[in-house]
Amino acid sequence: MKEYDIIIVGGGPIGLFATFYSGLRDMSALLIDAQDELGGQLVTIYPEKMVYDVGGYPGILAYDLAQNLIEQAKMFSPDIRLKEWVDWITRTQDNLWVIKTDKGNEFKAKTILLALGIGRITPSRLGAGGEIEYENRGVYYTVKRKKDFEEKRILIVGGGDSAVDWAINLAPVAKSITLIHRRDQFRAHESSVKQLYNIASVHTWHELKEVKGDGSKVTQAVIFDNRTKEEKTLDVDAVIISIGHKGDLGNVPRWGLNMKGRDILVNAKMETNLPGVYAAGDIASQEGVPKMALIAIGFSEAAIATSMAKKYIDPNVSIFGGHSSEIMKSRS
């Protein structure tokens, strides 16, 4: 069994940066993620949205940011495994960690970094008629490519920021936008809701009852007023159900980690209570420190965690390995 210096669990932006940084610190790394592509929420939930709070970018498309991070993560040739979920971790007698995946594979490492984000991401579904039948054939839970919705009659279900933002972002390319929400109050930002009413047909107190199609694509959607039960049939080409995503942590709460709710508790060094196991990003929380789910902060945590992992492996090395320009120059 190959032995790694570090196994990074989670292929979102924080896990990707940690993979790069571990390579910069001359650590052999395995990056493992449950999704079928790297990038985490950047590609799974909001690939077509702009990100403005990452240093060095006045604004960058989430998908493009993910691609840059993936390219950076691969600089030092880490091993990468996708569509594989870490089911269990075990400490060996020689103070190594063995992770076991849902596919029955086992991998050994000196240290582990948990960059799990919100966990394995799955969309929240309504359970409407025809929803599953037409999934990815007209029923969607996110927008991966705006061009796929050009000149489409689009029905959006939801009242949060994602639903309203998709309506606004797709309006310039869509043939028409209709948005339904089961209440008359929106969770989205007030200015966005005001803009929504200018670009879309909005039906409050309405829910989706059924999606209809011709067997290969969506052609209609049946909505109803949840107060009067009156139904309406809309001619549509696409239905976007934007009512949130669920994060599944699987067996993580049973690994012996100190946790608070869904968060893994760490100290200022990003160390968990398990020796050689670190956490960074949305999954990590420090007692007494305000939690800010920002990519920029996660990058810093990833650098600290990987540096502490390096120090754990070799107590004689400096925690700060030097500036990247100096490190790269020394390797050339």
UniProtKB/Swiss-Prot annotation:
<dbReference type="Pfam" id="PF07992">
    <property type="entry name" value="Pyr_redox_2"/>
</dbReference>
<feature type="binding site">
    <location>
        <position position="325"/>
    </location>
    <ligand>
        <name>FAD</name>
    </ligand>
</feature>
<keyword id="KW-0285">Flavoprotein</keyword>
<keyword id="KW-0560">Oxidoreductase</keyword>
<dbReference type="InterPro" id="IPR036188">
    <property type="entry name" value="FAD/NAD-bd_sf"/>
</dbReference>
<dbReference type="InterPro" id="IPR023753">
    <property type="entry name" value="FAD/NAD-binding_dom"/>
</dbReference>
<dbReference type="GO" id="GO:0004324">
    <property type="term" value="F:ferredoxin-NADP+ reductase activity"/>
</dbReference>
<comment type="subunit">
    <text>Homodimer.</text>
</comment>
<feature type="binding site">
    <location>
        <position position="86"/>
    </location>
    <ligand>
        <name>FAD</name>
    </ligand>
</feature>
<feature type="binding site">
    <location>
        <position position="33"/>
    </location>
    <ligand>
        <name>FAD</name>
    </ligand>
</feature>
<comment type="similarity">
    <text>Belongs to the ferredoxin--NADP reductase type 2 family.</text>
</comment>
<protein>
    <recommendedName>
        <fullName>Ferredoxin--NADP reductase 2</fullName>
        <ecNumber>1.18.1.2</ecNumber>
    </recommendedName>
</protein>
<keyword id="KW-0274">FAD</keyword>
<feature type="binding site">
    <location>
        <position position="121"/>
    </location>
    <ligand>
        <name>FAD</name>
    </ligand>
</feature>
<feature type="binding site">
    <location>
        <position position="41"/>
    </location>
    <ligand>
        <name>FAD</name>
    </ligand>
</feature>
<dbReference type="GO" id="GO:0050661">
    <property type="term" value="F:NADP binding"/>
</dbReference>
<dbReference type="InterPro" id="IPR050097">
    <property type="entry name" value="Ferredoxin-NADP_redctase_2"/>
</dbReference>
<feature type="binding site">
    <location>
        <position position="282"/>
    </location>
    <ligand>
        <name>FAD</name>
    </ligand>
</feature>
<dbReference type="InterPro" id="IPR022890">
    <property type="entry name" value="Fd--NADP_Rdtase_type_2"/>
</dbReference>
<feature type="binding site">
    <location>
        <position position="46"/>
    </location>
    <ligand>
        <name>FAD</name>
    </ligand>
</feature>
<dbReference type="GO" id="GO:0050660">
    <property type="term" value="F:flavin adenine dinucleotide binding"/>
</dbReference>
<keyword id="KW-0521">NADP</keyword>
